[in-house]
Amino acid sequence: MAQRAVWLISHEPGTPLCGTVRFSRRYPTVEKRARVFNGASYVPIPEDGPFLKALLFELRLLDDDKDFVESRDSCSRINKTSIYGLLIGGEELWPVVAFLKNDIIYACVPLVEQTLSPRPPLISVSGVSQGFEFLFGIQDFLYSGQKNDSELNTKLSQLPDLLLQACPFGTLLDANLKNSLDNTNFASVTQPQKQPAWKTGTYKGKPQVSISITEKVKSMQYDKQGIADTWQVVGTVTCKCDLEGIMPNVTISLNLPTNGSPLQDILVHPCVTSLDSAILTSSSIDAMDDSAFSGPYKFPLTPPLESFNLCYYTSQVPVPPILGFYQLKEEEVQLRITINLKLHESVKNNFEFCEAHIPFYNRGPITHLEYKTSFGQLEVFREKSLLIWIIGQKFPKSMEISLSGTVTFGAKSHEKQPFDPICIGETAYLKLHFRILDYTLTGCYADQHSVQVFASGKPKISAYRKLISSDYYIWNSKAPAPVTYGSLLL
């Protein structure tokens, strides 16, 4: 696993090139290995100028890039991985790992230890995951405590020396560049106990452990025969351990009720020291997989000082929390809408907020509205062609609510009115936004009494959980709609 080159590019809309290479590093020894491994399919690393132009074009970040380009924008080229192929001088440079964050484009080219023709599957290219870890480490270093451009420039000037230690000869040794900074500025001091690479100091103060479980539920609902509704839960467990000592040991347990949905596809933080194999083998890829493990999920770890994501997981819950249908029909100069939403009986009926956003794309401003709602309030944003149905904090006892009415629009202004290439004609959706505190759809919770801490002092244990909607769509059942098959992608 190694990297052939790395770039940091500032995105500057309005300038002639739309960007500037702030930092770049090439690794000639890795490039020689790439030439051997790739053989006839080898494509050399280009100069900064051609690379900058090709990358901005592929990311659609050029100011004059408004037209549809078949090779980049067709449905066969939908990119969901932040991994690209760049056409440079008639040849394609692949794989290029790149993403935009805080107006900085982070990019690198991992070494592929095999021929590139035919293109190997990404899962077989181990340098890709290391490339992401490398770029995320640089991002964390640049923006940890960074307050202004001068501090950013200072950190950019430190990168050449830091990468000599963190990534010598293109091989990543430590993604935490702060460790390399400490080694550069201070002489090494022999310590009685070695600290892990992700921990840069010790804590002094009142001991406490905080555990927060956040589940995001996605859904695409159609209310159509022959098209299956899809939904998926993605969970994140975030921890903050304020404990004295160089390497305090902690064991955190996640539990499920008897009717809970098993956790799958679990990814853990590097500070986890060991793990039951049953936790790692539970996968959502195979629908016939019977390896579901219902817990308890124990994570022994040596926590870092800062807040960290202990693990991520998915879960295949039996039903979405809110089921509904949306019907929109065009009648002469107005639209007739009918909406019905039903909260599942197993879901906690206590929201921090719950709203249904009903946008009308590719139309003029709302000039007239007549409606009837069984529950909640309706807000109208006329210029934005948007209705927001404020449901509030609870559904009624029936768990079912409805909204119906007619909407009339004025003349469309191309400059102000919202445009969407999918929502043409009667193709439309409503999007649900909600949050429920002290609740998870899987039932997953952190048992405060089962948290084991091997450190001085008795810590205060706090546990929180919440469910949040994410990409929760209900499409008009009277018109065509984009369809997702199988499980929703992360």
Curated annotation (Swiss-Prot):
InterPro entries given in the database record: AP2_Mu_C_sf (IPR036168), AP5M1 (IPR039591), MHD (IPR028565)
One term under GO cellular component: lysosome
Stored Pfam families: Adap_comp_sub (PF00928)
Alphabetical keyword list: Cytoplasm, Endosome, Lysosome, Membrane, Protein transport, Transport
Primary localisation category: cytoplasm
Signal peptide: none
Family matches, as Gene3D superfamilies: Mu homology domain, subdomain B
Role: As part of AP-5, a probable fifth adaptor protein complex it may be involved in endosomal transport.
Record-stated family: Belongs to the adaptor complexes medium subunit family.
SUBUNIT field: Probably part of the adaptor protein complex 5 (AP-5) a tetramer composed of AP5B1, AP5M1, AP5S1 and AP5Z1.
Protein name: AP-5 complex subunit mu-1
Species of the source: Macaca fascicularis (Crab-eating macaque)
